[in-house]
UniProtKB/Swiss-Prot annotation:
Residue numbers binding 5-methyltetrahydropteroyltri-L-glutamate: R18, E19, W20, K21, K112, W550, E594
One Gene Ontology molecular-function label: 5-methyltetrahydropteroyltriglutamate-homocysteine S-methyltransferase activity
Protein's UniProt name: 5-methyltetrahydropteroyltriglutamate--homocysteine methyltransferase
Pathway where it operates: Amino-acid biosynthesis; L-methionine biosynthesis via de novo pathway; L-methionine from L-homocysteine (MetE route): step 1/1
Organism: Staphylococcus aureus (strain JH9)
Any one Gene Ontology BP term: methionine biosynthetic process
Amino acid sequence: MTTIKTSNLGFPRLGRTREWKKAIESYWAKKISKEELDQTLTDLHKENLLLQKYYHLDSIPVGDFSLYDHILDTSLLFNIIPERFQGRTIDDDLLFDIARGNKDHVASALIKWFNTNYHYIVPEWDNVEPKVSRNVLLDRFKYAQSLNVNAHPVIVGPITFVKLSKGGHQTFEEKVKTLLPLYKEVFESLIDAGAEYIQVDEPILVTDDSESYENITREAYDYFEKAGVAKKLVIQTYFERAHLKFLSSLPVGGLGLDFVHDNGYNLKQIEAGDFDKSKTLYAGIIDGRNVWASDIEAKKVLIDKLLAHTNELVIQPSSSLLHVPVSLDDETLDTSVGEGLSFATEKLDELDALRRLLNQNDSVKYDKLKARYERFQNQSFKNLDYDFESVRTSRQSPFAQRIEQQQKRLNLPDLPTTTIGSFPQSREVRKYRADWKNKRITDEAYETFLKNEIARWIKIQEDIGLDVLVHGEFERNDMVEFFGEKLQGFLVTKFGWVQSYGSRAVKPPIIYGDVKWTAPLTVDETVYAQSLTDKPVKGMLTGPVTILNWSFERVDLPRKVVQDQIALAINEEVLALEAAGIKVIQVDEPALREGLPLRSEYHEQYLKDAVLSFKLATSSVRDETQIHTHMCYSQFGQIIHAIHDLDADVISIETSRSHGDLIKDFEDINYDLGIGLGVYDIHSPRIPTKEEITTAINRSLQQIDRSLFWVNPDCGLKTRKEEEVKDALTVLVNAVKAKRQE
């Protein structure tokens, strides 16, 4: 009988109570020393390693832990340093500056990691001299060994790393070949240090165009075979199905496949005999991206099927557990829903239950998890009926007619200025909200504070000279969690944090039941803000696609049904804002692109559903009401027509870190709706110059009709300091005023 082994691809960095985030931000704020930061993070890394050891994993990942981002770690490992940051010592301070920018230089681009809500720092190849320069991976592997942890190093593979990079004069293939000797050097150092195998993450090999670079992939791994290291390599793929016959032909020791998000294709390939039995199969059977407990009995059935076609089997999560919270231990959840949940720690417990059952015939833990899952499944969370057909899915009039009525009503100047929505969440704001939630202050005291903060920022915006204002969202902890707290069908946790980018953590709500709007969500704050000014104040909402993509979704209904339920709820709030006299309503969809399936065969339906849901949420308003939306930067070329089909009167897009790349996406489309391309990077504390903003405006106007163009920051300003926001917006408005005189 084959012995089943267990492993993991990666563990959350944040810590149970976001210790990682707090330590790093304290260091940035100069509240703790570098030595204190190092000690805190070392302690957290140790805790993560020993926790995984407690659940009897046969091999534990090292290299998943990072001070910011594992792709940026790889860039520094190979001396792929942006040209503007070259010449400095390669250390943690350089890492932070590349990621965040500084007073002299802009940060590197920040892009979604495949179709997740994690973001990576894009490697830049302009004028670089690749070499092994900072082997932190080796240091962390040796540290794990010192703890008597059976660890395996983790590194993003050469094909994926280069494919996610930008810049440089070399071709894709030339860049890969440049890195191969460096990867070999790193692999040899790890093997010499005692690594039994090395996890090489190549998720790019599950994407549509992977077949177009199969030749360079084969050349790369043949190179490693000739170097004598290939048999120690395990290629891990995740998020979709892989081309198994090709992967099996590579001279590596093992292959990792996703058996959760592959739509059943990977098992079909296994059963068709496409897997080379001389290799070890690393089977991703536990969902690494959602928080629902596994159907443990179904997982056992899957394992039995895989055992019939493999000689060595390791079971693992479908992807790194970076995408889920750390533990349920500190949560106080209603049992009816709580029994159906599984965070990172509980997923390790599921693996351990299967290992015990299959290797030791010990069914105690397995039976407990099976009974718990069955109790959850026996409940019904499908209780509501919906009338989707009675709600409009297109505006009353075309944009050309609407914009005339809107401009007459709003009377906006040339190149109107606005912000994306949120203003700084100061320590005082967070304290008041926490005190209110914990009932340490009265509703009246909290409402008074919010009104004072709204009034203060309305005046700040008027003094700066912005044209369309916002109330600042001080009552909101997160643009999705806020709606999760107020809409029926959502569950919000206390400690369910996950990393989005750098030290930015979000707490996705959990959709467990039918979604319904029961009362106004944002009307009071928005109407109050509008009462303080003659300038228009935007109502600020999050769109249905983003709410779904940034939540942990229920799995007992099709995505489209849940998405449309959310759209109906948002439509109710849009109409409530309009009825209250709000003239401009923004429905943000920053996550529309990130949810795009990795395989193009699913793109058309996804985009069709997304557009319909957005229009379901926004089309019932009158022509004179202006609908805005906002999206975060990504590769928009694939969805540019869908963006147009949303029929939003104005869209603002995060673009500054793309350094002009995004504008190319508008060359092939006559974009005839209002648009604002973000003119400065809000993810960096750096204040833009007037010249930089003017350059960004001029570059945008080469492709976009001036009468349709808006000027705005990249994104919401929640994470910035007040003085940074004031200074940056003042520069923005002054640049626009000068441009209006030309």
